[in-house]
Regions:
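Histidine- and aromatic-enriched segments that form or immediately flank copper-ligand environments
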Residues: 39
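Acidic/aromatic-lined carbohydrate-recognition and catalytic surfaces
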Residues: 46-208
Length: 697
């Protein structure tokens, strides 16, 4: 791999960080763009002025047109942020104005059980829209102390929009399902930007109106703006049917809802959704397949209604659709926010994530690894990360320079290739100091501007990020080990709640996945996440991401998709090492069939699962200091390149066991130096930084 030393020392703008600039200096915007370049930034993320009507105000559009013209004249690439406030989709309230029917909706369940005959009368409350469905079922009380609903005895019950009158026999239960707006207690009411009500991301008409009001006017006012932009940045569109604060209890446990869902469910599965509704709220393991199917459908619908629709519009106007979604860190948030976040992310042109815990000890390593999987499925050159040191800013502020260095390395070793940043600089050192007090965003909407970095620090950070981006451009992590992405286990166990708690059973897959992931990282091992679709592909080709897969590790699951199990059986027979950590699954995710896998597969401890024989792959060993993370790549001229990253606070020493005296090129993205060395030596990896080693022979 031939490296241009001058290019490595001064990497191109496309690889450097882009600050989030929501507000520009009123009279000195062109000069401020020069300040951004002077501080080493590569471009910006910006938007139509968000106050005074957002895109409905011609003055805002005219001002944005002038900013875009100045950006193009200054040579600064730009991304277009698509919202006024947060989250994307509301248009600062424009979208729902005069169209309240497009608001996010949830379905709640009212349950009435009787053990003696009685008449039931029910009337809808003032917060709800209408009754959607009702049915009664027999209850089996033959087992002492239990009341088991017999779902096969379902009898629909007549109802009007707002009332029900029904005769219940002994040992019957009546389920009433009602629709209401999904707003109170949601992320709409607990964020730093607004209290706006929000659209239903399951409804393509709502998303179309968002396009009509917040995309079309921008293109009309600034023709070609989306074609000239790097991409659109959409910000955390999501369902609002779950609660986010532990100190709040609400009378409604909400299921995401939209009128088209029953028809889509029938198209996808050939089943009637209505009789399954009780199983989505409660019940034993017999209910798990209904939930897996429902939440898979939800992910599909959001992916098409929101992401694919916006992506297609952007493509039609010569642009790309990107941004990030809510709660990338935990699978339970993948389910309750999107049904299956992966189904939504993979519809992007360029997936993304955000990082809130921007210090190495607080960093969530699974976040980037999950999005890395989406980027691989999209076929994109990595993905975007929005760096937001908003989670515990006091901790970040203890050593902001080192913390951001470590965070950037952790991002890029996991697949990030573009960085948008809320880690702001102090621009006092530029020119006559006129930007000393300038704030690039509304602090009431986006939180306090803290100005962590001076000019020298920001130039160094931008150079470091730019050099990593230059070296990793177009390259993917080469891994022989995959970890299974067991989203179906969470889908099966998730039920709507009256508060923000999800329960130990529901979060079990998250915790099991993290135990396995952290054990891999503690061994210095790299890996890829793979879902059921990927396992099927590996069974067909033996490869994922161009690399032969030799080892498949599965976290402790109770539920597994049948196609995943079929692929695992085939791969095990072909000699691939398949290990279940902690326990074997026992439920088929789609049929509910009991699985008996003991004897066919082995459940081992987490530590046993991650012990990979050194002969299987080249692996640097940490001799002293913090464990060094590493990733291996194949360069464009087919050489092996290692990225060695030390996220710790002291230096580390590593060695490649069995290495010979082959020549290698060592690239330090912090200093910009390139040296020629021999491979058979000890290597020092500085604290919170990384180095690259290319084996030349």
């Amino acid at each position: 791999m031939s490296i241009d030393k001058a290019l490595f020392m001064d990497p191109p703008a496309q690889y450097r960080m882009n600050p989030m600039i929501h507000i520009w200096p009123e009279h000195d915007s062109r000069l401020f763009m020069e300040a951004l370049k002077d501080y080493g930034f590569g471009g910006v993320v910006t938007n139509v002025y968000q106050e005074d009507g957002f895109t409905s105000n011609p003055k805002n559009l005219h001002r944005f047109s002038a900013i875009v013209q100045e950006l193009e004249q200054s040579g600064l690439p730009y991304w277009v942020y698509d919202e006024s406030g947060y989250p994307s989709g509301s248009g600062g309230g424009l979208v729902l104005r005069e169209h309240p029917e497009l608001e996010a909706k949830g379905l709640y369940m009212h349950r009435i059980i009787t053990y003696t005959p009685r008449e039931v009368r029910y009337r809808l409350d003032c917060e709800s829209d209408r009754i959607v469905w009702a049915a009664k079922y027999q209850v089996d009380v033959s087992i002492p102390q239990d009341s088991i609903v017999r779902y096969e005895t379902m009898q629909p019950v007549p109802f009007s929009d707002d009332s029900i009158r029904c005769e219940l026999q002994a040992c019957e239960v009546l389920y009433i399902f009602c629709q209401k707006p999904a707003y109170e207690g949601s992320h709409c009411t607990h964020n730093i930007c607004s209290y706006d009500r929000y659209i239903n991301v399951l409804n393509p008409d709502a998303v179309r109106r968002f396009i009509d009001l917040c995309y079309e006017p921008v293109e009309a006012a600034v023709p070609g703006v989306y074609a000239h932009a790097q991409a659109v940045f959409t910000d955390e569109p999501a369902l609002q049917t779950f609660y986010v604060r532990p100190y709040e209890q609400w009378p409604y446990a909400l299921l995401p809802w939209e009128a088209r869902l029953p028809g889509i469910f029938r198209q996808m599965y050939g089943e009637d959704l209505y009789p399954l509704l009780p199983m989505l709220f409660e019940g034993t393991e017999v209910c798990w397949p209904a939930r897996v199917k429902f939440y898979e459908m939800i992910g599909h619908v959001i992916g098409q209604s929101y992401t694919a629709q916006l992506r297609n519009w952007c493509r039609a106007h010569g642009g790309r659709f990107s941004g990030h979604y809510f709660g990338e860190e935990m699978l339970v948030d993948h389910v309750r926010s999107y049904g299956n976040m992966l189904s939504v992310q993979r519809q992007s042109d360029y997936p993304g994530m955000d990082i809130l815990a921007c210090w190495p000890e607080g960093y969530f390593p699974q976040d980037a690894k999950y999005v890395q999987m989406a980027a691989r499925k999209c076929g994109s050159n990595g993905f975007m990360a929005e760096v937001c040191p908003f989670d515990n800013p006091e901790e970040f502020g203890k050593a902001p320079f080192d913390n951001l260095l470590a965070t950037m390395g952790l991002n890029y070793i996991s697949g990030v290739r573009t960085t948008q940043s809320y880690a702001e600089a102090d621009f006092s050192a530029f020119g006559d100091g006129r930007f000393r007090d300038f704030l690039p965003r509304n602090q009431d909407m986006f939180g306090q501007v803290r100005k962590y970095f001076d000019r020298a620090q920001m130039r160094q950070l931008n150079a470091y990020v730019g050099r990593m981006g230059l070296l990793l451009d177009g390259l993917q992590n080469q891994c022989t080990t995959v970890l299974y992405f067991g989203i179906e286990d969470v889908q099966a166990k998730y039920t709507p709640k009256h508060d923000c708690e999800v329960g130990a059973q529901t979060i079990g897959c998250d915790l099991a996945t993290l135990r396995l992931l952290r054990a891999m990282l503690d061994e210095g091992r790299d890996f890829l996440f793979a879902d059921a679709e990927d396992l099927t592909e590996i069974a067909r080709t033996g490869r994922l991401g161009g690399e032969e897969i030799r080892r498949i590790l599965l976290p402790g699951l109770d539920v597994i998709r049948p196609e995943a199990l079929a692929a695992l059986r085939q791969l095990k027979k072909a000699g691939v090492c398949v290990l279940f950590a902690e326990k074997l699954p026992h439920i088929d995710a789609l049929s509910g069939q009991q699985l008996q896998l003991a004897g066919e597969f082995e459940a081992v401890s987490v530590q046993e699962a991650v012990q990979i024989p050194d002969a299987q792959e080249a692996q640097f060993k940490t001799l002293s200091g913090p464990i060094v993370r590493q990733a291996r790549y194949r360069t464009r001229d087919s050489k092996s390149m290692f990225f060695l990253l030390n996220p710790g606070r002291t230096e580390s020493v590593v060695r490649l066991p069995g290495a010979d005296a082959r020549r290698c090129t060592v690239l330090d993205p912090f200093t910009g130096t390139i040296t020629q060395e021999r491979l058979n030596r000890d290597w020092t990896v500085p604290a919170v930084r990384g180095i690259f080693i290319i084996i030349e022979e």
